[in-house]
């Protein structure tokens, strides 16, 4: 069985991976996100790849520098990134409260899409690497929000670390009219698809 490394500081992704019984360590990527793509699906795969590759590179460097201390083993690094998309606009995490208000007003009473990209970087015992990348899309419909509801939600602080300025699994759940697709994908990690992709690649978690 491979040692699994989650290249994300998101507590929601950590919880989702724990739910499927995976044993892993958390090692968040710290590099600056560089976006060269425009389509939401391509953006999330690009960013998830950057995160996974950064952490995998660090693992390889450490193993080379401490070869006498490291027991060779297969390693799987998982990187993920989530964005909200509405009318060709990509919404990441809000920069400030005003940005969160702008996003929530935009999404109020509408249907938008949530994209999560996932990248696996495999490192075998000999230090050879391989990659596999995919994305999942879920459509989410919101009820119409009043300005008071938006202000109250923003004052809770909950939107500030979430793509699109809301968390479907928290207090904002009362404003969700419906979803089409994987609920966990909106939370931050499509674990069912992740598991199926690993199975196709012959990886046991």
From Swiss-Prot:
Its EC number is 3.6.1.9. It is found in: Cytoplasm. Its cofactor is a divalent metal cation. GO terms for biological process: nucleotide metabolic process. The keyword Hydrolase applies. Keywords: Cytoplasm, Hydrolase, Nucleotide metabolism. The keyword Hydrolase applies. Pfam families: Maf. It catalyses: dTTP + H2O = dTMP + diphosphate + H(+); UTP + H2O = UMP + diphosphate + H(+). The active site is at 81 (proton acceptor). GO terms for cellular component: cytoplasm. The record marks 12, 82, 169 as: Important for substrate specificity. GO terms for molecular function: dTTP diphosphatase activity; UTP diphosphatase activity. Belongs to the Maf family. YhdE subfamily. Nucleoside triphosphate pyrophosphatase that hydrolyzes dTTP and UTP. May have a dual role in cell division arrest and in preventing the incorporation of modified nucleotides into cellular nucleic acids. This is dTTP/UTP pyrophosphatase.
């Amino acid at each position: 069985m491979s040692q699994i490394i989650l290249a994300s500081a998101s507590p929601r992704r950590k919880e989702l991976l724990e739910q499927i019984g995976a044993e892993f360590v958390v090692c968040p990527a710290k590099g600056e996100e560089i976006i060269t793509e425009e389509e939401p699906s391509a953006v999330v795969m690009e960013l998830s790849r950057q995160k996974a590759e950064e952490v995998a590179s660090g693992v390889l460097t450490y193993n080379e520098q401490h070869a006498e201390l490291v027991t060779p083993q297969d390693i799987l690094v998982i990187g993920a990134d989530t964005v909200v998309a509405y009318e060709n606009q990509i919404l990441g995490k809000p920069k400030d409260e005003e940005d969160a208000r702008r996003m929530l007003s935009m999404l109020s009473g509408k249907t938008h899409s949530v994209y999560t990209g996932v990248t696996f970087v495999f490192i075998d015992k000999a230090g050879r690497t391989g990659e596999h990348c995919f994305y999942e899309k879920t459509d989410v419909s919101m009820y119409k929000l009043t300005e008071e509801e938006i202000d109250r939600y923003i004052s809770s602080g909950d939107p500030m670390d979430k793509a699109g300025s809301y968390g479907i699994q928290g207090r904002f759940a009362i404003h969700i009219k419906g979803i089409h697709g994987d609920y966990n994908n909106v939370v931050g990690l499509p674990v069912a698809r992740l598991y199926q992709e690993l199975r196709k690649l012959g990886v046991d978690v």
